[in-house]
A protein has these predicted regions:
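Zinc-dependent metallopeptidase catalytic helix centered on the HExxH motif
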Residues: 1-62, 66
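Histidine (H) residue identity feature
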Residues: 10, 14, 59, 78-81, ...
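Short consensus segments that form the blades of beta-propeller domains
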Residues: 39-41, 82-83, 215-220
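Generic detector of solvent-exposed, compositionally biased contiguous segments
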Residues: 55-81, 235-249
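Active-site-proximal alpha-helical
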Residues: 70-137, 141-144
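Beta/coil-rich, acidic/histidine-enriched accessory regions frequently appended to metallopeptidases
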Residues: 114-288
Length: 288
């Protein structure tokens, strides 16, 4: 028979999600609840994983579907944000690269109410918040050029990013525009000019949590990860160290045959809290 399309594949994915709970109704798995106060709100992880499952069959649609454009426009948001819930389907690929293709099913089966997917991930894999922040930054920098096992071949024509919105200041610094400021685990990609091979490039980073003009929430838990990504002429990538100081200098030696160069910054809170589906961005954190 002819393929039925990714929409039907998405809905079949929901059937498996329901079945996860039905097979283990007393275990607390399956995410049959929201992540707001008293388990209020919807659950965007259902939509994200159904999309991801559909694209295991319709591979090219990861990148040629309109949801991909939505992802590029919203990657600064929390990965469990309700607005781009149909577009946040790449973190699953990163987790499968680290833990195997079976991991997403394991995550659904072994989650325990009232955990969100991040809490379940940390418990199941045994990582703490600091390590999780490192992993989310590693995912972000790999997403710039789709350097992820299993999707590289489909993303090779979509490498790189457009410049994020920056505001120049009189003291020589650039600040992210509030409209694109990273939330927890969201990220910005700053496009840089490519210097000659062997030249050391540096970025003087200053975290500004609580600054006027940005949303202020749990400012005492502010954190960041940042570093450089080089895309080479042969399609491979070279990554800098991961930097995390609130105020610090990141240094990277430009490799040979560098074609594109980026500076990536991600929100990395020192403590995790759940993101509620409330259709209200004004109570979401920002890490300028």
């Amino acid at each position: 028979c002819q393929p039925v399309g990714s929409t039907i594949a998405h809905e079949v994915g929901h059937s498996f999600q329901y079945q996860t709970y039905c097979d283990n109704p007393t275990s607390g798995c399956g995410w049959r609840y929201g992540f707001g106060e008293n388990e209020e709100g919807g659950n965007c992880f259902w939509e994200q994983c159904a999309q991801w499952q559909a694209y295991q069959i319709y591979h090219e649609e990861r990148f040629n579907n309109y949801n991909f454009d939505e992802y590029l426009l919203s990657c600064y948001k929390h990965p469990l944000h309700e607005a781009p819930r149909y577009a946040n389907y790449f973190i699953q690929d990163y987790w499968c690269m680290k833990h195997g293709i079976e991991f997403i099913g394991k995550l659904w089966r072994e989650a325990r109410r009232p955990e969100d997917p991040i809490e379940a991930y940390q418990r199941i894999t045994g990582v703490n918040q600091e390590t999780f922040n490192d992993e989310m930054f590693d995912a972000a920098r790999r997403f710039v050029n789709w350097d992820i096992d299993g999707i590289k071949e489909y993303g090779r024509n979509y490498v790189g990013r457009k410049q994020c919105k920056l505001i120049a200041s009189k003291d020589g610094y650039y600040a992210i525009d509030p409209a694109e400021c990273p939330e927890n685990y969201g990220y910005n990609v700053i496009v840089l000019n490519v210097p000659s091979a062997g030249v050391k490039v540096s970025a003087d980073f200053v975290g500004m949590a609580g600054a006027d003009g940005y949303r202020k929430k749990n400012v005492d838990k502010a954190g960041w990860r940042y570093g450089f990504v080089a895309y080479l002429e042969n399609g491979s990538c070279v990554y800098s160290d991961i930097f995390s100081e609130k105020e610090g200098e990141a240094i990277f030696e430009c490799p040979n045959f560098c074609r594109k160069l980026y500076f990536v910054v991600s929100g990395a809170p020192t403590q995790h809290w759940r993101h509620a589906w409330d259709d209200n961005d004004m109570n979401d954190e920002q890490w300028p």
